[in-house]
Amino acid sequence: MPGDGFIEGVEPGGLKDISEIKILICYLLKSVGKPLSFKSLNEIVQHDGLCNYFAFASALHDLLVSGHIDIVKDGNTELYKNTSLGVETAELFERRLPASVREKAIGTAVKLLAKIKRESENRVEIE
């Protein structure tokens, strides 16, 4: 649909349905097995045009309100993690997501987490 802000930037095969985006978020959090920041989650879903930024932000908010995900603090950083309801949702509905979307999301997540780990281990101080 022309002018639909929730589909701008979505690549062919990407997700346009908000319920599928919610499933993707729960699936990602379950699959990586650790809480992720908004920035990391957004980078994962935006990398291959899996969904639109505004649809992602809306889905994340809805999941918080519905109790599927929670926020945990790591210093000053807010991280998102699945609740038991989010894990159950991912397990029940992950097959609704196209295999290509699941594979791209996990591939990007693995690369991003490796990059974050490298950066945290290789701190440089300039004197």
Which residues does each PLM region occupy?
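Short, cationic-aromatic polyanion-contact patches
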Residues: 18, 74-96
